[in-house]
Regions:
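Surface-exposed helix-capping loop/turn segments at secondary-structure junctions
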Residues: 2-9, 76-83, 105-108, 133-134
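Short, conserved micro-motifs composed of acidic
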Residues: 3-40
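RNase H-like, metal-dependent ribonuclease domains
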Residues: 20-33, 53, 78, 85-87, ...
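Basic, alpha-helical interaction scaffolds
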Residues: 33-105
Length: 259
């Protein structure tokens, strides 16, 4: 990595030991001669990871950020000069639902009690966009807005990811999903550990009757895009005014260099 110009920052690098047990064992990790700080949770690519992979801190942070964004919808949905429901739903999808979707494949392994905290954000956003009362039934909100519950949406995004991953065996995550390890351990009735994505998604694939072996592999181009010849663009007609140039002249001049 040093040859490629990449260097780890000693002050920004942290270590975290993922462990489900009660004992808190943290190995000493050194970067050169500097000991890396050991933390209980850290943010990586917008997701907050904790030692036990409960994603409780991430869900709390995500809920707080989404509730602040809902204030924008409340302002825009003014009864006198506010936007209509169609525009408000688009704003909700762009500002709030996009945040809920990001990383849902990862934090979807959290327990249901933590994930339900996000359902209130989703339902509140739909109520604001539709102008519905607080007593409106949740299934009616989903039907009127054309939205599904967050649980079904997370499942949809997960299945889309798995199907796309199946078409690319060169992906680094391919073996982890389709060649899982310790399957028998997670299938034990006494196991309390959360199964990985590869095991959680199997019942849904079987219920949907998706034939994974029939998914075609994605074809990669033989030549890299940056190695292709740059196409020649003819801009001769830009020197003539449209008013002074007839349609027939334009057609003849544009086809002449290609004959």
């Amino acid at each position: 990595m040093i040859k490629n110009g990449f260097k780890f920052s000693e002050t920004k690098t942290v270590s975290m030991h993922f462990w489900k047990g009660r004992a808190n064992y943290s190995p000493n990790v050194y970067l050169g001669r500097t000991r890396v700080n050991d933390v209980t949770e850290t943010r990586f690519l917008g997701l907050i990871f904790d030692r036990r992979l409960t994603f409780k801190s991430h869900i709390e942070d995500l809920r707080t950020r989404c509730l602040k964004t809902l204030n924008v919808l409340r302002v825009v949905s003014h009864t006198d000069w506010g936007a209509d429901s169609k525009v408000l739903l688009r704003l909700y999808q762009a500002l709030v639902r996009s945040k809920l979707d990001y990383g849902s494949i990862v934090y979807g392994s959290a327990c249901k009690s933590n994930l339900k905290k996000l359902d209130t954000v989703h339902n509140s956003g739909l109520r604001i966009a539709l102008g519905a009362f607080r007593t409106s039934p949740i299934p009616s909100l989903h039907t009127e807005a054309g939205e599904t519950s967050l649980e079904l949406r997370r499942l949809k995004l997960t299945l889309n990811y798995v199907l796309k991953l199946k078409s690319d065996p060169t992906n680094p995550a391919y073996d982890s999903v389709f060649n899982p390890k310790c399957v028998d351990y997670f299938n034990l009735p006494t196991t309390k550990a959360t199964p990985p994505l590869s095991i959680r998604v199997l019942p849904h694939l079987e219920a949907a009757k998706l034939a994974m072996e029939r998914i075609e592999l994605s074809e990669r181009p033989v030549t890299s895009p940056w190695l292709l010849d740059t196409p020649e663009v003819l801009l001769n007609l830009t020197h003539h005014k449209i008013i002074m140039t007839s349609r027939g002249c334009i057609q003849r001049n544009s086809a002449l260099p290609h004959q």
